[in-house]
């Protein structure tokens, strides 16, 4: 016989689905949502704690590094580069305030008051006997992006082509100057002791800041004096040189007059002859830039001869500093050589001139134009009223960043200010 269901049971079974759907299910659903939210919040909190610990460890490391550096009296950051083989160490920070109303005055102040910095950065143990570099400054001249004072193991230079090419490259590749969107050529203007140098970084196709090569438009260059006779000790004897300006004054001499072929094997002889020639020409010949009073010495000797590379017009080695030999074709030397050839009618405006270094690396150069400066004359000027002939020279080469360096000067280090074994 079938059992009858009491009204209460009947109501319970009929009402249960509604009760579950409207009362129990929301509770279960809410519990699941709360659990999900809790898990998400837990993960966020856990991630924040992990990030906080990571930051704390990084801060402790940074603080420890600062404590370690604090015991050093001086520290400098540098970009180490080379241009066609020649070193270019660019000091980007660490200098105290250097007074001066222009780069020439800053150069003079460094030379007279803080030359130990140059020695410490250029010479051993941080550098070497053929090191080259520059101090980077905020520009003073209007329109410039960077200020530069150039240095080597022997002192300071008013201008340097290979280091200017390096600076233009570094300025773009490290973000010192901004690169416009879709740019292919980026202008970088340098404020130097010799004047404004206008550079251009040529970007690799499809890249935003990778420089394929760089060009500089140098300060006005000119032939200063022609066929100057200089008598050197044996075995060299009497030689004839041209004196030209390309940012620095150069004594330009054919290698055949010295009886030395331009090769790495003959480097020590080339250095000896170059140093002898520079010393004698500064002793016996007075030079003076007609517009820049602080430029009044021959700083470099440019020895040139037949090229090895069929693409080149000539091959050279430039001796400067403390008997240093330029590994690149020398940018200011290329400018001086082109100014000399142009004055002699042996190079035309716009004609490509290729100079080869002792390593075999190349600079491409062009004379972009000429100008006469009325009332200004140098020894080769025939007509004072017509004025001195100057040319605008462009040099193109390739520079590479090799590393970023922090140099520390330990006050207890007996060699902190550098040394050289070269006598």
UniProtKB/Swiss-Prot annotation:
Signal peptide: 1-31
Activity sensitivity to pH: Optimum pH is 5.5-7.0.
Activity regulation note: Inhibited by maleic acid, iodoacetamide, iodoacetate and, most particularly, pyrrole-2-carboxylic acid.
Organism of this sequence: Trypanosoma cruzi (strain CL Brener)
Binding-site residues for substrate, renumbered to this chain: 161-162, 326, 331-332
EC number, as in UniProt: 5.1.1.4
Function according to Swiss-Prot or TrEMBL: Catalyzes the interconversion of L- and D-proline. Secreted isoform 1 contributes to parasite immune evasion by acting as a B-cell mitogen. Probably involved in parasite differentiation and infectivity.
UniProt keyword terms in alphabetical order: Cytoplasm, Developmental protein, Glycoprotein, Isomerase, Membrane, Secreted, Signal
Active-site residues, record numbering mapped to chain: 160 (proton acceptor), 330 (proton donor)
Gene3D superfamilies given in the database record: Diaminopimelate Epimerase, Chain A, domain 1 (3.10.310.10)
Reaction catalysed by this enzyme: L-proline = D-proline
Database matches in SUPFAM superfamilies: Diaminopimelate epimerase-like
Glycosylation sites (chain numbering): 213, 266, 282
A UniProt-annotated Pfam family: Pro_racemase
Complex and partners: Homodimer.
GO CC annotations, alphabetized: cytoplasm; extracellular region; membrane
Protein family (similarity comment): Belongs to the proline racemase family.
Protein name per Swiss-Prot or TrEMBL: Proline racemase A
InterPro entries according to UniProt: Pro_racemase_fam
Superkingdom in the source lineage: Eukaryota
GO molecular function, one term: proline racemase activity
């Amino acid at each position: 016989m079938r059992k009858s269901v009491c009204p209460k049971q009947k109501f319970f079974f009929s009402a249960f689905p509604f009760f579950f759907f409207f009362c129990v299910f929301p509770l279960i659903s809410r519990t699941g949502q709360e659990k999900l939210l809790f898990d998400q919040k837990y993960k966020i909190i856990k991630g924040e704690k992990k990030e906080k610990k990571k930051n704390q460890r990084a801060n402790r490391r940074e603080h420890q590094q600062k404590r370690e550096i604090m015991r050093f009296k001086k520290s400098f950051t540098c970009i180490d580069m080379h241009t066609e083989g020649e070193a270019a160490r660019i000091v980007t920070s660490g200098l105290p305030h250097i007074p001066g109303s222009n780069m020439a005055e800053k150069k003079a102040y460094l030379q007279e008051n803080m030359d130990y910095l140059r020695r410490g950065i250029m010479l051993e143990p941080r550098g070497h006997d053929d090191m080259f570099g520059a101090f980077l400054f905020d520009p003073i001249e209007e329109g410039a992006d960077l200020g530069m004072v150039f240095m080597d193991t022997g002192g300071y230079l008013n201008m340097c082509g290979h280091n200017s090419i390096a600076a233009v490259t570094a300025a773009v590749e490290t973000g010192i100057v901004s690169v416009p969107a879709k740019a292919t050529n980026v202008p970088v203007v340098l404020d130097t002791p010799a004047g404004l140098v206008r550079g251009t970084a040529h970007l690799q196709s499809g890249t935003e800041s990778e420089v394929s090569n760089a060009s500089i438009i140098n300060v006005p260059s000119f032939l200063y004096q022609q066929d100057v006779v200089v008598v050197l000790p044996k075995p060299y004897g009497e030689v004839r040189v041209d004196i030209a300006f390309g940012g620095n004054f150069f004594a330009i001499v054919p290698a055949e007059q010295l009886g030395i072929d331009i090769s790495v094997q003959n480097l020590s002889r080339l250095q000896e002859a170059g140093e002898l020639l520079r010393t004698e020409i500064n002793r016996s010949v007075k030079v003076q830039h007609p517009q820049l009073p602080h430029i009044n010495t021959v700083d470099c000797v440019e020895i040139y001869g037949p090229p090895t590379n069929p693409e080149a017009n000539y091959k050279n080695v430039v001796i400067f500093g403390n008997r240093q030999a330029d590994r690149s074709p020398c940018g200011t030397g290329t400018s001086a050589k082109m100014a000399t050839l142009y004055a002699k009618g042996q190079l035309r405006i716009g004609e490509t001139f290729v100079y080869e270094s002792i390593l075999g690396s190349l600079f491409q150069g062009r004379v972009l134009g000429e100008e006469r400066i009325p009332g200004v004359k140098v020894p080769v000027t025939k007509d004072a009223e017509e004025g001195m002939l100057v040319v605008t020279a462009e040099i193109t080469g390739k520079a590479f960043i090799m590393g970023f360096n922090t140099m520390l000067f330990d006050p207890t280090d007996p060699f902190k200010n550098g040394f050289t074994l070269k006598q």
